Swiss-Prot record:
Keywords: Cytoplasm, Histidine metabolism, Lyase. It comes from the Bacteria. Contains an active site 4-methylidene-imidazol-5-one (MIO), which is formed autocatalytically by cyclization and dehydration of residues Ala-Ser-Gly. One of its GO terms (molecular function) is histidine ammonia-lyase activity. This is Histidine ammonia-lyase. The gene is hutH. It is found in: Cytoplasm. It catalyses: L-histidine = trans-urocanate + NH4(+). One of its GO terms (cellular component) is cytoplasm. CDD domains: PAL-HAL. Belongs to the PAL/histidase family. InterPro entries: Aromatic_Lyase, Fumarase/histidase_N, HutH, L-Aspartase-like, Phe/His_NH3-lyase_AS. The modification 2,3-didehydroalanine (Ser) is found at S149.
Length: 515
């Protein structure tokens, strides 16, 4: 099996796990390709060479591309065809993709090409691996793909560097392609028949975008469970809605697992829960009581999207595909990123709901009648405004996400003179997840601050061991609010803590797919 130890990855094509993909996204990796891949790679190249020797016509090998597929290319022009393809398709715009995402894209591309269905030589695959290992990351603009026929423009920018064109970043410095190749011990390559198309065709950029959204969504989910539990304690909420019997009766797996996690976080009892054991409150508002139902549904969406993205991360999404055993090349549509687009749309729903529910809990804490805490969680109200506008900020972020959650997979614009007449919009579907995640991080930061403030206002009362850990983590960076002060730095400090995933260890690792 594919193994990942610290920063070393021995890749058996088609066997990457979500945990490995998360690690690749987080840190540089030293990549080796398992020798078991060599034979199928070589066989696919030999198949392409046979087709050329037999003077057979095969799309992408000795024809033009897209609407120009019926144009036969002379043998002496095949190398120029591949170079022209890469140069002409490198038409992206926007800011450069970050190094961590470029690294993930490149590993995904190596994984796909090494499956042996692409007719690309080992020397080209090895060059990509050498760039990864040298931490040389091609300049890839953020925008320019509609997710079918694959991620052509961004992958063309990735491939430019192999030809000695374009530029790449190494340890924060931009280098021209020739110098960047030299850092990795390489010289510019001349691509053979089919190789340019193999490099450009594929869903690796769309998949990497969505994977980042998945990883951030998982981290936010874990944080939201903890923040929501802290809020239950801060407003003297009931533990009864988390009773396992309720959730078993419904049978929704995500809900059952979420409820179990809330029970672990809250513990069987605490100083807070004992303080109101005999109160006359009958039911809590939905934002407290229905957390397992809402967050359980979000968990189900995260898990389903993760399953799709893990499959796609190991998929062959090239076109045409080389089936060496049958001496055949078949044109299909594996480049269409509709599965990725729909997975990203589902992630957007989950991320939006995580933030929406958190914002409602913040609002609850502001209301003295609902929370039994001072208005806006501060003494001497009127002179002090406390969390009043922090809640408004959370509301603004939650509202932004409602618009951003609109599905992208229902959109399509025909391209390539209507030859490519239905596209997935998967890159846009994945990319907007990052903004949504940043918004939710801000919302959860406010809730974490508010819940800890509420608990501190209940002087002398302790919550569960796990929730006290979360409380201490925050208080190590942000002190109690005695009176109004400049608020934005505190939200930023809490957001930075959330970005560090410091709350992930408080939930079971088994809960989320990539942890």
């Amino acid at each position: 099996m594919t193994t990942l130890s610290a920063k070393t990855l021995n890749l058996i094509p088609g066997q990457l796990t979500l945990a490995q993909l998360r690690a690749i996204h987080q840190q540089p990796v030293s990549l080796t390709l398992d020798s078991s891949a060599n034979q199928q790679i070589d066989d696919s190249v030999a198949c392409v060479e046979r087709i050329l020797a037999e003077n057979r016509t095969a799309y992408g090998i000795n024809t033009g591309f897209g609407l120009l597929a019926s144009t036969r290319i002379a043998s002496e022009d095949l190398e120029n065809l591949q170079r022209s393809l890469v140069l002409s398709h490198a038409a992206g715009v926007g800011q450069p993709i970050s190094d961590d995402l470029v690294r993930l894209i490149m590993v995904l591309k190596v994984n796909s090409l090494s499956r042996g269905f692409s007719g690309i030589r080992r020397v080209v695959i090895d060059a990509l691996i050498a760039l990864i290992n040298a931490e040389v990351y091609p300049h890839i603009p953020l925008k320019g793909s509609v997710g079918a026929s694959g991620d052509l423009a961004p992958l063309a920018h990735m491939s430019l560097v192999l030809l000695g064109e374009g530029k790449a970043r190494h340890k924060g410095e931009w280098l021209n392609a020739v110098d960047a190749l030299a850092v990795a011990g390489l010289k510019p390559l001349t691509l053979a028949a089919k190789e340019g198309l193999a490099l450009l065709n594929g869903t690796q950029v769309s998949t990497a975008y969505a994977l980042r959204g998945l990883f951030e969504g998982e981290d936010l989910f874990a944080a939201a469970l903890t923040c929501g539990s802290l809020t239950v304690e801060a407003v003297l909420g009931s533990r009864s809605p988390f009773d396992a019997r309720i959730h078993a009766a419904r049978g929704q797996r995500g809900q059952i697992d979420a409820a179990a996690c809330y029970r672990e976080l809250l513990g069987e009892s605490s100083g807070v829960s004992e303080s109101h054991r005999n109160c006359d409150k009958v039911q809590d508002p939905y934002s407290l009581r229905c957390q397992p139902q809402v967050m359980g549904a979000c968990l189900t969406q995260l898990r389903q999207a993760a399953e799709v993205l893990e499959v796609e991360s190991n998929a062959v999404s090239d076109n045409p595909l080389v089936f060496a055993a049958e001496n055949d090349v078949i044109s299909g549509g594996n480049f269409h990123a509709e599965p990725v687009a729909m997975a990203a749309d589902n992630l957007a729903l989950a991320i939006a709901e995580i933030g929406s529910l958190s914002e409602r809990r913040i609002s609850l804490m502001m209301d003295k009648h609902m929370s039994q805490l001072p208005p806006f969680l501060v003494a001497n109200g009127g002179v002090n405004s406390g969390f009043m506008i922090a809640q408004v900020t959370a509301a603004a972020l939650a509202s932004e996400n409602k618009a951003l959650a609109h599905p992208h997979s229902v959109d399509s614009l025909p391209t390539s003179a209507n030859q490519e007449d239905h596209v997935s919009m998967a890159p846009a579907a994945g990319k907007r997840l990052w903004e949504m995640a940043e918004n939710v991080r801000g919302i959860l930061a406010v809730e974490w601050l508010a819940a800890c403030q509420g608990l501190d206002l209940r002087e002398g009362l302790k919550t569960s061991a796990k929730l006290e850990q979360a409380r201490s983590l925050l208080r190590s960076k942000v002190p109690f609010y005695e009176k109004d002060r400049f608020f934005a730095p505190d939200i930023e400090a809490a957001s930075q803590l959330l970005s560090s995933t410091c709350l992930n260890p408080l939930v079971p690792a088994r809960l989320l797919p990539s942890l």
